[in-house]
Amino acid sequence: MRIKKSDFITSAVKKNQYPIDNRVEVAFVGRSNVGKSSLINSLTNRKKLAKVSQTPGKTRLVNFFLINDDFYLVDLPGYGYAKVSKAEKDSWGKTVEMYLTGREQLKRVVLLVDSRHKPTGDDIIMHEWIKHFGYDVIVVATKSDKLTRNELKKNEKVIKETLKLNSDDKLYFFSSLNKDGKDELIDNLFLEFATDLD
């Protein structure tokens, strides 16, 4: 499928601010500065659809983007940034938890990890939490252009072992810089929810 149209619709903190048109939602979650905004911009061919912040932990809202007038891509606040207060961390945690708990429109959660590093304790908890609530989860390892082919192979093994991925679990490597595998990634993330398959 092709992403021909992408529009920012709304930012939300509370449930009553979420869209109410019952379209399917695919949520993106990951550590602060894992490259979430860059990935969203890359997939949609929009340089500034999702704001790329140089300051980790800046995205504190749940952001809804309408794709092809068909389904929502949902950008969740990043977690795991050390240099914020406990109150702010708790607030972000509640925002994410509120969205992920009992959201019927949410059909898939895409967990982003940094391909250069072993997944963190926060990544492991988030992966287990997503699976516990029964959501379909796909892991995308970002910034893969920074690794050699040998390093990619080695790190793929580390990511799979750390997150305890089985043979059915999906893991994709992606670089927002060179966009290798972009079409395949779009199909794997969104195709089954799209009504316009062009």
Curated annotation (Swiss-Prot):
Residues 22-195 form the EngB-type G domain. It comes from Clostridium beijerinckii (strain ATCC 51743 / NCIMB 8052) (Clostridium acetobutylicum). Pfam families: MMR_HSR1 (PF01926). InterPro entries: G_ENGB_dom (IPR030393), GTP-bd (IPR006073), GTP-bd_ribosome_bio_YsxC (IPR019987), P-loop_NTPase (IPR027417). One of its GO terms (cellular component) is cytosol. The keyword Cell division applies. Mg(2+) binds at S37, T59. GTP binds at residues 30-37, 57-61, 75-78, 142-145, 174-176. GO terms for biological process: division septum assembly. Disulfide bonds: none annotated. Its cofactor is Mg(2+). The keyword Nucleotide-binding applies. Necessary for normal cell division and for the maintenance of normal septation. NCBIfam families: GTPase_YsxC. Keywords: Cell cycle, Cell division, GTP-binding, Magnesium, Metal-binding, Nucleotide-binding, Septation. It comes from the Bacteria. Belongs to the TRAFAC class TrmE-Era-EngA-EngB-Septin-like GTPase superfamily. EngB GTPase family. CDD domains: YihA_EngB (cd01876). GO terms for molecular function: GTP binding; metal ion binding. This is Probable GTP-binding protein EngB.
